[in-house]
């Protein structure tokens, strides 16, 4: 049987690190097994779903290289959901309710005050036809699925054996009074119709999975296998949801995070395997195993992405960055030497711009007060650009002979005067790249 997985985001916002984890796991399972990966936009919320978010989700996945085999939109399938609702009505598994949100909240609070679980009391099932007709005329009805009050069991791909007593769960609302089809229902119908065989999602969906298993069975479908991964927290264990605004993929991308650095962290975070940098999707897939993930909350720190990004960037061949370097205005004959000098001194590729500015426009000299006279004298011994591979050795030899300085007292002030930095690349490689020197004699 062909493995079919899906990633089903709601286009009510951009992808963040939390749902990226879900996307990556489902993509990896499909790709590793030679199966099908579906991108399904769960866009039945007409008020909050926006095209810009749909476009953004696809752009972010393409940036990561998480390509999909099929694109589906729930907004194209509303007629199918109406058909499925009729099937459930005919089977006696769908019933109309009329409580207002306020009335439901009062029922919930009353049960909690009595120390009971806040499970819907199925009062709507006790209504007579006359009462139902009167309420329907007064207010719009919403629809619940009638659960079989028995244990729902499955073997979870991460959590292991799961058993939930359906009697402890409210009959789920599947269609709102305004006619909006809710996620629990639309997703169940889609997963059956699209032949989904394996679903990975967050641990906050476990109870939802139990109800969806019954919905799928009531529609004559075979539920897929499920795996529920742990939820991410902040670095200190705090709820991540409050910070997701700064952890969208596009925000991380703007900070220079590389796709493979992000995927490498997400492919191992929360698993028993150590985090390591994968340079290709093929390497990542070879080491991916959903069964290695655990149930405990998983700490995420965005700063962990930057050592991985630095490692990835510094290992790139020149051909991979040729276009970016050319866009900076680096002459062709200096492009490869520039990359060789700059690559070990950057954290993200955007740092290249700063290095080329230093070489092309000259650095603001950093001169300690006690070195001012020394630098003035030294600069009189420096010829104008261009410089060659021997220029640094020739320059420092001339300065040493003229001033008597040597060692760190010679080299450090000159480095700071020419580059504005106390540390950096080998000066013998820097000199041929210098187009301008701002320190004066």
UniProtKB/Swiss-Prot annotation:
Motif stretch ('KMSKS' region): 239-243
UniProt: ATP binding residues: 242
Protein name per the record: Glutamate--tRNA ligase 2
Domain of life, source organism: Bacteria
Residues spanned by motif 'HIGH' region: 9-19
EC number(s) stated in the UniProt entry for this protein: 6.1.1.17
Compartments, record wording: Cytoplasm
One Pfam family of this chain: Anticodon_2
Subunit composition and interactions: Monomer.
SUPFAM superfamilies named in the record: An anticodon-binding domain of class I aminoacyl-tRNA synthetases, Nucleotidylyl transferase
Keywords: Aminoacyl-tRNA synthetase, ATP-binding, Cytoplasm, Ligase, Nucleotide-binding, Protein biosynthesis
GO biological process: glutamyl-tRNA aminoacylation
Class of enzymatic activity (EC top level): ligase
GO cellular component terms given for this protein: cytoplasm
Role noted for this protein: Catalyzes the attachment of glutamate to tRNA(Glu) in a two-step reaction: glutamate is first activated by ATP to form Glu-AMP and then transferred to the acceptor end of tRNA(Glu).
Family note: Belongs to the class-I aminoacyl-tRNA synthetase family. Glutamate--tRNA ligase type 1 subfamily.
Swiss-Prot/TrEMBL catalytic activity: tRNA(Glu) + L-glutamate + ATP = L-glutamyl-tRNA(Glu) + AMP + diphosphate
GO molecular function: ATP binding; glutamate-tRNA ligase activity; tRNA binding
Gene, per the UniProt record: gltX2
